[in-house]
UniProtKB/Swiss-Prot annotation:
Organism for this UniProt entry: Desulfotalea psychrophila (strain LSv54 / DSM 12343)
Binding site for IMP: D13, E14, G15, K16, N38, A39, G40, H41, T131, R145, Q226, T241, R305
Enzyme class: ligase
Protein's name according to its UniProt entry: Adenylosuccinate synthetase
Pathway(s) per entry: Purine metabolism; AMP biosynthesis via de novo pathway; AMP from IMP: step 1/2
Binding sites annotated in the UniProt record for GTP: 12-18, 40-42, 307, 333-335, 415-417
InterPro entries: Adenylosuccin_syn_GTP-bd (IPR018220), Adenylosuccin_syn_Lys_AS (IPR033128), Adenylosuccinate_synth_dom1 (IPR042109), Adenylosuccinate_synth_dom2 (IPR042110), Adenylosuccinate_synth_dom3 (IPR042111), Adenylosuccinate_synthetase (IPR001114), P-loop_NTPase (IPR027417)
């Protein structure tokens, strides 16, 4: 039995969906442990494109069990839409294939309204770049102990009372502070009672089920969302998401004991991207950045927003090693760098003449950073058709090796394209457990 956590090591959009899909082959259980439908995992299987926002991508395998942990915040309407979309493509998501923690908090209509109203009220320089899906306000209610959980839908009287109190408070804020329309109690109540009827068979105790799976020697894969630098505590605050995206939250967000985790795989692009506002030391503003953007199809799966692009940031990578305890890398989009005569990698930062080897916590300092680059030779030939790692150009392998040496973490997986087949597994994290530096 092995338990493996997969996390994004940059600012999200690293290709976690594809890597999770690959590792699902070796898993019995696949678990989402944080975030909501603000994240999108895209994967291509047999030429067919799938985009998942809530359901773990392991649902594509009939013999696998998928779980949504207590750390996830759930929009029932979006979940049902995703299930309906899969059914149209011949895949019915049944309760024996998907379990939702009854401790997961629900995104309510007033959460998205508050999210959008608050973002609209901010000045351009202070906008976070939220997706407007109610993620932040839902987490605020959770921490404020006034949230509504999935299990509350099973008790009609309890749900009615909690909803009444919540709408009374939210309507005051919406109408008085933002001048926005009020939320109608009756329509929300009826809508969520309908959701309860459809989703209640899926509710259960994820923590207990995972412990039973562990004791039965099952392989468990924990699927993270977003990226390390978007972590609410360890990221470039306030330009972050509202949950902990680091590997430690795999345990808190699912009710799984930390001593049972065997390996942590960090997903990292061969270059760097970021969506929305916030510090980005290696960002490229010239034709090179535009080239990476176009060749890498850097547009968000959830929002369609154009991603900012830059060179590989070794400092960010080392931060991810430290914060997650990474045991291996999954390096994606190596193919996008084909054709570059030379490739840069940030090995440190300069802040007003001071050399830094970690992202500073002060946001003004983070925005003032200048990357200190080292340069390595690029390669001319396209690599998207290569299936054997040894067949890669020498320069491409040297680049991978430089990332391994710089971070002290080996590459488990190298990806050279979006399709499942365009992936090379150098070592299986379910079988090999190596310690980081």
């Amino acid at each position: 039995m092995s338990s493996v956590v997969v996390v994004g090591a940059q600012w999200g959009d690293e290709g976690k969906g594809k890597i999770v899909d690959l590792l699902t082959k070796y898993s019995d259980y696949i678990v989402r442990f944080q975030g909501g439908n603000n994240a999108g995992h895209t994967l291509v299987v047999d030429g067919k494109k799938f985009v998942f926002h809530i359901i773990p991508s392991g649902i594509l395998y009939e013999e696998k069990t998928c779980m949504i942990g207590n750390g996830v915040i759930l929009d029932p309407g979006v979940l049902l839409e995703e299930m309906a979309s899969l059914k149209e493509r011949g895949l019915e998501v049944k309760p024996n294939r998907l379990m939702i923690s009854d401790n997961a908090h629900l995104i309510m209509p007033y959460h998205s309204q508050l999210d959008q109203a608050k973002e609209s009220a901010l000045s351009a320089s202070n906008k976070i770049g939220t997706t407007g899906r109610g993620i932040g306000p839902c987490y605020m209610d959770k921490v404020g102990r006034v949230g509504i959980k999935a299990g509350d839908l099973l008790d009609e009287d309890l749900f009615r009372e909690k909803l009444r109190c919540a709408i009374e408070e939210k309507n005051f804020i919406l109408t008085k502070k933002f001048g926005a329309p009020a939320v109608d109690f009756d329509s929300v109540y009826r809508q969520f009672m309908d959701f309860a009827e459809q989703l209640s068979p899926y509710f259960g105790n994820v923590s207990v089920t995972l412990d039973e799976a562990r004791r039965a020697d099952k392989n468990i894969l924990f699927e993270g969302a977003q990226g390390t630098q978007l972590d609410i505590d360890h990221g470039t605050y306030p330009f972050v998401t509202s949950s902990n995206t680091v590997a430690g939250n795999a345990c808190a967000g699912s009710g799984f004991g930390p001593s049972h985790i065997d390996a942590v795989v960090g997903i990292v692009k061969a270059y760097t991207t970021r969506v929305g506002s916030g510090p980005f030391p290696t960002e490229l503003f010239d034709e090179k950045g535009e080239e990476l953007q176009n060749k890498g199809s850097e547009f968000g799966a959830t929002t369609g927003r154009r991603r900012r692009c830059g060179w590989f940031d070794g400092v960010v990578a080392n931060d991810a090693v430290r914060l997650n305890g990474l045991t291996g890398w999954a390096l994606t989009k190596l193919d996008v760098l084909s054709g570059q005569k030379s490739i840069k990698m940030a090995s440190s930062y300069d802040l007003n003449g001071k050399k830094l080897h970690a992202m500073p916590n002060n946001i003004k300092d983070a925005e003032a950073l200048k990357p200190v680059y080292e340069e390595v030779p690029g390669w001319a030939d396209e690599v998207d058709g290569i299936c054997n790692y040894d067949d890669l150009p020498t320069e491409a392998k040297d680049y991978v090796r430089r990332i391994e040496d710089f971070t002290g973490v080996p590459a488990n997986i190298v990806s050279v394209g979006p399709d499942r087949a365009q992936t090379m597994m150098l070592s299986n994290p379910f079988e090999t457990k190596k310690c980081c530096k």
